[in-house]
Amino acid sequence: MAQEVTSISGTVVDGDTGETLPFVQIYFLKSTTNKGMIPSEVGTTSDIDGNFTISNSAGYNTLNFQMLGYKTEMLTLRKGQNRKNVKVKLTPDVYGLQDIVVTPKNRKREYKRKGNPAVELIKNVIARKDSFYVTSKDQYTAKSYSRMSFALDNIKVNWEKPFWKKFNFIQKYVDTTGVYPNVTVSIREHLNSEYYQRKPHREKKILEKKRVFGVEDLVSQGSFQENVNAIFKDVDINDNSMNMLFNRFVSPLSSTLAVTFYQYYIMDTIMVDGYPCIDLAFVPVNSESYGFTGHLYIVNDSTFRLKKYAINVPPDINLNFVSNYSVEHSYKQLEDGTWAPDRTTTYAKFYILNNKRGMLARQTKIYTDWDLETPIPRETFSALTADEVETNDSTAQRFGAAAWDTLRPEPLTWYENSVYDLVREATANPSIASLVATVNAITSEYVATTPARDLDESKFDFGPIYNFVSWNKLEGVRLRIGGTSTARLHDQFFFRGYVAFGTTDLRPKYNATLVWTFDKHKSQPYDGLRHHIQVSAQYDVEEPGQNTDIIRRDHILASIPTSTPTMPFAQYVFHAKAEYMKEWRNKLSIRTSFDFTNNEAAGVLNYHKVDWTMNADSSWSKSVTDIGSYRNYEGMVELEYSPGSRIYIDRMGIRSPFAIEKDAPTFRLTHYVGYLDDRHNGGDGFIYNRTEFLFDKRFWFSAFGHLDLRVQTGMLWQKAPFTKLYMPQTSTSIFLAQRAFNQMKPMEFMMDEYVALYATYYFKGWILNRIPGINKLKLRGVVSFSGIYGGLTKKNNPYLEGTNGLYDFPHTPWENNDVQNAFDNNGYIKDGYRTSSPIGKLPYMEITAGFENIFKFIRIDYIRRITYNDYELPYLIQKMEPINPNNPTLGFQPAVDENGQPVMIHGRRKIGAWGRNGVKITFRFSL
């Protein structure tokens, strides 16, 4: 039975000055038979204002308060007591270490770096941080065991109430020995072989054996597992910045920022695993910056070696869904004197609505079998980059519970061992099974067809659910139903497809795709390394030039436009496509395909072939032939190299927008060769080649944010109609699309050579955290720039006299086929008319500035279009002039020259205020 809860809350202050003390270490003590009173697992720290709250139900009643530069204070409570508004006074102390004396009293005012022995100490540690550790050796191998557990925290319910009574089987699995009662719901164990080579720098981790049981094995694993791996990835305190929780934290051993970013205090000399060590405490200068509080335990000799460290994420940091995150890491000395990692313990508490109830996560990693001498076989590092590469989970050997009892270096607790029984009982409960199925459907976008809606057991899943209903101007309400097979049906052969119907165009659409993978898969064809052959047939609506990888065209979110939509430039396209793809472990991949399409103009799009004829007087006459449709035969080869990337590919073969880490660079070179056949409708036919290159990378600036950068360039080498030209990616939805132009209309500009730049800087609260009042909102600033510079060569410009066979650029049909009716008296095209034109000499540019982390998941951006707010169109119209220049209200008349010939000018487009400026939102959960 659970014991009574003992709790206390209050403020810690300086006993002399009354100043509040932040970051005081507060923990309950527990009694042992041979060591007396020792720190328990129940602890916390005071916040920036010195406030604290702590409680436990394990029977602990002695509380310890410890602060750098102050005498330790102990407070005894009655078991079950609940005290509030307690003021705890700490007495300043002076710590001596040999001839070093540091007095951190009033540290905020008196801390100095110059002449500070703590600063000199950390400088010595930093200068020697690479000298004694295994990473300084030419090579090494080691074994590592890691265990990760997840637990539901603060399980305080009345099991006798009607609602909870049906879940009362959980009660026997509740662990009451911690701060709050919790239930362990998932365990993951890995045994790895780790390899390291210094020159050239290479690291590899091979997952030898694994065991996953519990809730994690029930939910859709894909991106969930990848994100968990990224959150709990290995970190090295010797690096200048530490990659944790999808952010960069300044390391207390940073060679560039440590001394200016942190304040250091010598606390005492203590014994750590038999070594006399200096306890060096540190706190960030700004508690809301991306840094740590903690302790470094430095061997007290001339080597300045780090024996152990304990770091915590400050509670005031601008971090979502994490109320506690700490890492404790220790080193051991090998026989040759080299220091190597010994054990790492990572603890985190995640929450959704408040930080009292949430999910506890704990990972323990133990290193053994260090070998610095045996040569590493060459094939171990074959085709690998300098980045760590982990084998696909499906290659790991799986062992039963009995075998793991002999493999793991330390046993599971009773509660960890009971997870299997808990899950077995939970999955038999209809209410819990329905909840798991609902969560799986929302996160995976698919609904399983098994009775229990278990994605791991289903042979066919319906989805994506967010594409079942959508809307667009051409189709009206679009209804779609589809799905995909899973590895439960066949682990190498997969099929997927859909049928769709528009209530306005009344045309059925469909897709049927077959995939054969050369390797066996455990869920879908794109998990792990991709190596497959894929064939598909599809008939659907497309908008020329628009890439549906940004957001699927019939996604429900794409149905919400920023303004009243016009009839789209669209086409009905039939595809018959075959594709081969091979991806290697170093993230080099090759993809080849052949695609036959039949393209039929739809909406207000027309394929109007333009021919020019020179007249006897050397003038030119223009004739137009309606092509209607054309056939296209296209081959493609794509090479991509993304060293160190961990990218989740969804069931449609599209990169997930929740893609894990984006730090790895991506280089992509694509070449298309094709033949556009329009001869059956009076066209000329075109052979074309098009080449594109893309570079994508996230650049981190330690705790000061990061820059997401994409550079893209391409060229069409031969003459071809506008459907083969480059048309920048655009977004007409109210939702912000990154790496697309949000204030440009679809197909507004045409080009056959271009360079595009997309850059977004995330400040991560760097500036806003320093503004009083604003910092309480936890907002984060973000700015972006998107620009494209390009051109249209003469061979692909249908408006140049003598350029025959090309298609007229798309435009809303003029009234009565008269171009003049589409323009006002000043030569500007009227609202409601869409046109495409060659891009001019200036680059197109737009900028955004906004705030993210509004209510933790909303981002709002103001967008401004910088260029092409008033520009020339390729259409010639007759100039209009006032009938009476002195009284324009009398009307206008067509202008003629002195010979009575019409005065022709280029029409213009003027972007209105709503076109130049916009506001868009994004829903984005981030830590």
What are these regions (language model features)?
Residues 6-8, 16-34, 58:
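Short, ordered, surface-exposed loop/turn motifs in non-cytosolic proteins
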Residues 59-69:
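A short, solvent-exposed beta-strand micro-motif common in secreted/extracellular proteins
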Residues 94-95, 106-277, 283-291, 353-470, ...:
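Structured extracytoplasmic
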